[in-house]
């Protein structure tokens, strides 16, 4: 059976993904950087987190990610260790070590943030994760924490420019796989529309 995520998107779908999934947000200083864990492109994630820290873009960070194939250490432990080695103070980085998916990243992290800082003291969050997952990070956060302002920074190691993702077979497969999750996940209540008003603007 052919993987439906290997389909060749037409021009309309490419344009829709570029406009509605690969969202660019202005980045301004935020209260919290939310680092969504991974085993892939860890160094690039850490590079971006360190750049944001040096530029004064966040006061606190949380790294979320459990033990997944590839290491006996949690994704959180690996990423936080690298962030600290690059100069971000350990005491500024909260830890969540159980999450196995994006929903759990958020659900398991909120009580940790609340205990350490207080959710009411956070007004803005920068989401940091993979390019192909893109809008689903803030959509997941918006489902469980609608009150805060959300910004999005994404990274990847593909040599293909982001807007030309459809010209690289693996980049395209990942992008379409994530894009195909959006409507079913909204219908199931796993994520919420973000940016607010996006549905009206279609």
Could you describe each region identified by the protein language model?
Residues 1-175:
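A structural signal for short, hydrophobic/glycine-enriched beta-strand patches
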Residues 161-202:
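A structured, mid-to-C-terminal "fold-capping" secondary-structure block
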């Amino acid at each position: 059976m052919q993987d439906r995520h290997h389909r060749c998107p037409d021009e309309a779908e490419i344009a829709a993904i570029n406009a509605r999934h690969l969202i660019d947000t202005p980045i301004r200083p935020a209260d919290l950087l939310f680092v969504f864990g991974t085993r892939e492109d860890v160094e690039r994630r850490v590079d971006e987190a360190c750049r944001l820290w040096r530029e004064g873009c966040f006061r606190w960070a949380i790294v979320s990610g459990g033990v997944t194939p590839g290491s006996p250490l949690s994704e959180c432990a690996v990423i936080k260790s690298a962030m600290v080695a690059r100069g971000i103070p350990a005491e500024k980085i909260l830890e969540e070590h159980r999450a196995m998916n994006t929903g759990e990243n958020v659900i398991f992290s909120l009580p940790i943030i609340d205990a350490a800082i207080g959710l009411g003291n956070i007004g803005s969050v920068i989401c940091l994760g993979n390019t192909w997952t893109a809008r689903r990070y803030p959509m997941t956060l918006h489902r469980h924490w609608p009150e805060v302002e959300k910004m999005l920074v994404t990274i990847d190691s593909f040599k293909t420019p982001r807007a030309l993702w459809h010209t690289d077979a693996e980049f395209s497969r990942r992008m379409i796989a994530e894009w195909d999750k959006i409507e079913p996940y909204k219908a199931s209540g796993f994520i919420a529309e973000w940016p607010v008003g996006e549905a009206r603007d279609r």
